[in-house]
Amino acid sequence: MKLIQSGSVDKVKEALEGDPSLADYRDPQGLSALMWAVYTGQTAVRDLLLKKRADLGIALDVFEAAATGSEAELHSILSKDAATAQAFSGDGWTALHLAAAFGTPLSAGSLIFRGAKVDAVSQNPQRNQPLHAALALGRNSSTMELLLAHGADPNATQVGGFTPIFSAATANRKDLAELLMAHGANPQLTDDQGKTPADFARERGHEELAIWLEVQPA
């Protein structure tokens, strides 16, 4: 896993040539080498592992397919067993969380169509919902629109009392804050420490956004 985190494609390729079974290596939580590449943002290593696994005939699971935007594989998995749309990974995410964070709107849509719950709470310390994941990492407005259109709560809280708009404020994304507010997000809600999204924006140097957030109605 350290080799993957290093981002060295050549070294990973060399390791795979020496032991092809490493393409399907999983840690004690069941996380594959592929998911580690996704989590650490090593896109070149991710693509190398995807190709190697395809060459070896190693199928993706629903979480890997969702996180890598592998639409054909995801469709095949869900067609055979729609219940996987509501399953949790070894580290506590649903496939919809992963699609929202790392995948594509099409992947998220396929999962919702097959019964994935937009209000599923992760079974890990974050205790968040797919919309939180979309704001924290993916920040794809189309994915957000999809989740909100299917009933995602824009004021849902995760651990710490953070609603999705806190992530928009942190990232200086007024457009995403506006999208959330158009669906009912309250920009004046506070986290467990009594801070508002405007406070988060200001602490990160986004003064213009902070001022704008402060004058928005609750």
Describe the predicted segments one by one.
Residues K2-S8, W36-Q42, E64-S70, L98-T104, ...:
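Ankyrin repeat A-helix N-terminal signature
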Residues M1, R26-A33, G57-E64, A87-A95, ...:
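Ankyrin-repeat boundary/"N-cap" motif
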Residues M1-D27, T68-G90, A95:
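N-terminal segments that cap or nucleate solenoid repeat domains
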Residues N155-K195, D199-F200:
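Ankyrin-repeat and related helical/solenoid repeat scaffolds used for protein-protein interactions
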Residues K11, A44-V45, E73, L106-S107, ...:
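Conserved ankyrin/ankyrin-like repeat signature
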Residues A100, K117-E145, Q158:
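Eukaryotic tandem repeat interaction scaffolds
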Residues K2, D47-A67, S76, K80, ...:
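Ankyrin-repeat-protein effector appendages
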Residues E14-S21, D47-D55, L78-T84, G109-K117, ...:
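Ankyrin repeat domain, specifically the short helix-to-loop turn at the C-terminus of the second helix
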